[in-house]
């Protein structure tokens, strides 16, 4: 089979990775994508590392069963827990992960604190703490674990009073006037960007890693000579692990902007 015409696999613990897929479609409009959301087991951020590894390997096997030419782990928690093991196990296929976009936040050189919102597991993992240590001397960073936020997005709640109350409560431990930027360290969180901006104001820059990951994916495809050069719009197939998944597929398409 012509590798250039093979699809690209995307995986997340639920609907969050669609925020990355949304960017990837813009960067790679000719490619076909297969998206697998493991909403049945969401959220990953409060599970053990071993549990997340097992679920991530199962998801990658599912995608490989669909003859994908590359896999994007569009989940910060799964990247933290499993990316090294995945790359060691699947050496013949590019596996791209995602990490909190600390570098762009630091390079803004804005006065004030950089707040990193993520799941408890992402913030506890060595991979993230090594990344924090790398930039610690250049900016003041505050880690903000957000258990429960993924669940809002999984239900399709991306704005409104209930979500606003949750965010206000989480951010109440930090003086908002001292925040220069917010790094969204979970792929579910870009969907609540609008609500977050309402609370923090327009001067606070909100950054996520979706574009960086999509550009990295394109680089890997070029390197592997597997970029689809056909002049046609690609397709997207969405799968989800929930038993009755009609509603979550509908939410997924809505978040992706295809309905």
Curated annotation (Swiss-Prot):
According to the UniProt record, what class of enzyme is this?
A: isomerase
Show the GO MF annotations.
glutamate racemase activity
UniProt cross-references to InterPro entries, sorted A to Z: Asp/Glu/hydantoin_racemase (IPR015942), Asp/Glu_race (IPR001920), Asp/Glu_racemase_AS_1 (IPR018187), Asp/Glu_racemase_AS_2 (IPR033134), Glu_race (IPR004391)
Alphabetical keyword list? Cell shape, Cell wall biogenesis/degradation, Isomerase, Peptidoglycan synthesis
Q: What metabolic or biological pathway is this protein involved in?
A: Cell wall biogenesis; peptidoglycan biosynthesis
- Which reaction is catalysed here? L-glutamate = D-glutamate
Supply the EC number(s).
5.1.1.3
Reported function: Provides the (R)-glutamate required for cell wall biosynthesis.
Regarding protein family, the annotation reads: Belongs to the aspartate/glutamate racemases family.
Q: Under what name is this protein listed?
A: Glutamate racemase
Organism equals Clostridium novyi (strain NT)
């Amino acid at each position: 089979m012509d590798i250039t015409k093979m699809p690209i696999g995307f995986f997340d613990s639920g609907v969050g990775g669609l925020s990355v897929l949304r960017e990837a479609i813009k960067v790679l409009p000719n490619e076909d994508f297969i998206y697998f959301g493991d909403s049945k087991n969401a959220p990953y951020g409060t599970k053990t590392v071993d549990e997340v590894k097992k679920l991530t390997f199962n998801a990658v096997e599912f995608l490989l069963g669909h003859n994908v030419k590359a896999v994007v782990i569009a989940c910060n928690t799964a990247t933290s827990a499993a990316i090294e093991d995945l790359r060691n196990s699947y050496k013949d296929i590019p596996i791209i992960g995602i990490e909190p976009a600390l570098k762009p936040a630091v390079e803004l050189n804005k006065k004030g604190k950089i707040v990193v919102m993520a799941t408890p597991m992402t913030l506890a993992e060595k991979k993230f703490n090594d990344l924090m240590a790398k930039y610690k001397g250049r900016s003041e960073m505050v880690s903000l674990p957000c258990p429960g936020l993924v669940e809002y997005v999984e239900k399709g709640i991306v704005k409104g009073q209930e979500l606003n109350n949750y965010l206000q409560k989480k951010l109440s431990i930090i003086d908002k006037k001292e925040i220069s930027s917010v790094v969204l360290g979970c792929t579910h969180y870009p969907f609540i960007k609008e609500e977050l901006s309402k609370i923090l104001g327009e001067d606070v820059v909100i950054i996520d890693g979706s574009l960086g990951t999509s550009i990295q994916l394109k680089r890997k495809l070029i390197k592997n000579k597997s970029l689809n050069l056909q002049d046609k719009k690609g397709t997207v197939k969405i799968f989800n692990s929930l038993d009755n998944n009609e509603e979550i597929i509908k939410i997924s398409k809505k978040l992706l902007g295809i309905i």
